[in-house]
Amino acid sequence: ARVNSAGASFTLLGTKATMLKSTKPVIAVCAVRTGCGKSQTSRKIVELLMEQGLKVVAVRHPMPYGDLIKQKVQRFASIEDLHRHNCSIEEMEEDEPHVIRGNVIYAGVDYEAILRAAEEDPKGCDVVLWDGGNNDFPFYTPDLLVTVVDPHRPGHELSYYPGEITLRQ
């Protein structure tokens, strides 16, 4: 609002201009609001796919705290990896549940490089799972998009931006 009221233009680019295409199937988990349960939903989907014998590599929405050059591409397959990358408490809360289940999760700030690394992960990759953040839409073109809504906040699915985008996709 401050930018617009000062006379400048501000536009959030749409999905066609921002989403990257993967060579692997992509499942994206997003939400209309933060706090709807994306992380729990993501972990359950990973669990179900792993039970089917698929190798799932998760990619987390960025939390750019600290040295962004060092955070270009981060791969977490163990608790030690989380400590080596000096993850914040918030990052640990998101990533630790994946690695203790034996899943690999990527993060960072260069999402083209992250996607290519995930597709070629040393442990293998059959499916990329986008674990969204806040109420943003996915950075990767999903083959399946799961949008989580909060039953305790009815109506919010149509009144929060950009979360409403994922509901309408």
For the regions a protein language model found, what residue spans apply to each?
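Flexible phosphate-sensing "switch/lid" loops adjacent to ATP/NTP-binding sites
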Residues: 1, 27-31, 40, 47-169
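Short, basic phosphate-binding NTP loop
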Residues: 1-28
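Conserved glycine(s) of the Walker
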Residues: 36-37
